[in-house]
Amino acid sequence: SYFLILFSFIPASIIIGPAISLFNILLIDISFIFFILFKKDFKFLSNKTVKLIILLCLYLVFNSVIAKDFSMGAYRNLGFIRFGIFFLAFNYFFYNNYFVNRVLVIWALTLSFLSLDTYLESISGTNILGYGEAYGARIVSFFKDEPIVGGYINGFYLIIIGFLFYLNNKILNKYKYIILIFTIFFITAIILTGERSNSIKAILGFFLFYFLNDHFKFKEKILSVLLLVLVFIFLLNTSNFLKLRYGGQFFKPIISIFQSNNEISIEREANKNLYIALYQSGFEVFKKYKIFGVGNKNYRLETCSNEKNPKYYCNTHPHQLYFEFLAEHGIVGTVILIFILFSLILSKIKIILSSKNYLQLGCLTFLLTSFIPLLPSGAFFADYNLTIFWINLSIMYAVGNKTNVFRFN
């Protein structure tokens, strides 16, 4: 019951704030360490997956040592160890289907309530607690001072949809269309936030998940895609804010670049884009620190310094995963990170597809869309993003007979 409460509280703790989320994860980690010491079961340490995670932790410690400023990245890099323990705790307790079902039902209720609040804010301008006016049409929901609710829903909705398919295969043919509508309910909430990158990831995730879903015939899959496209078009035609976010600020500049035959016009159009400037800045930092990078969380220190390169753009990170890796970890660190992360994710694809475990498939889909090139993203090693990433990775391993690091041993 103790661990059931802590795991059930994870999504709500993220909404309440980073301090509460961190406290909850540390409570899970510390409690699990004592629990595993009491059980004296350390066979999991010989598992290849666990060894890869230990290697990732060791690399991040090394990254702190060679960073421009040790103190800037040390807290983040050393703190990463908690996600390794978090991963093990998920694998141990999600061994039990009863535990999984109880936890994910509460997660589903939490996400549904947050999504309904997003709909309310899109209509009234404020959420149920009155948050939202400070950001105008941008939706914040219960996050109060950060417009990140779209990314949050995107991080959890495939877990919930996968869980509904995973819950009872015998009744799926009867209820699969209800689950499909539930999926579109979540994606619509993401689109309403105006978070373009997360909307693209959510839509691509929808396509991939349902394309690989054997409960739908090919014709049903095509109709599902058309339904989502119609919903998207309807939303754009009924909201000036969404027209601006997706049309004026996203599709129009891309179309202008492709339609122009003049290199000067293309360069001028590209220079108007904030993200192009951020990507260029990230690449400039990489050019200066090619081998090992400037160090995790040191990007801001480099780009905001007094003696800065005119191509630098002062910010906390380059807002794109691959440029972030190159700038802060260099070519060596980027190769190490991509090798470990891709090994953790891609090595299990065949097992997941053959087992037809849709909870695993939902998590896998989210993880794959996290690595789409060029799309803007939050800082990968920031607590909020890393928490959602490792929740998906942990569940993907934990609920499979051939992937759970304890069950496998």
PLM features per residue range, with description:
Residues 10-11, 29, 61-62, 85, ...:
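Alpha-helical transmembrane segments of multi-pass inner-membrane proteins
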Residues 120, 192-193, 213-266, 280-288, ...:
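A membrane-periplasm/extracellular boundary helix in multi-pass inner-membrane enzymes
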Residues 71-75, 143-146, 193-201, 315-320, ...:
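Membrane-interface catalytic loops of GT-C/OST-like multi-pass glycosylation enzymes that act
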Residues 1-72, 98-101, 105, 163-177, ...:
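Transmembrane signal-anchor hairpin modules in multi-pass inner-membrane enzymes, especially those
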Residues 328-350, 390-393:
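Selective detector of the "anchor" transmembrane alpha-helix that sits immediately C-terminal
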Residues 128, 264-329:
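Long extracytoplasmic/lumenal interhelical loops at the membrane interface
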Residues 49-56, 70-93, 102-111, 151-156:
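Aromatic-anchored transmembrane helix interface
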Residues 27-33, 158-159, 203-207, 340, ...:
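Transmembrane alpha-helices of multi-pass inner-membrane enzymes
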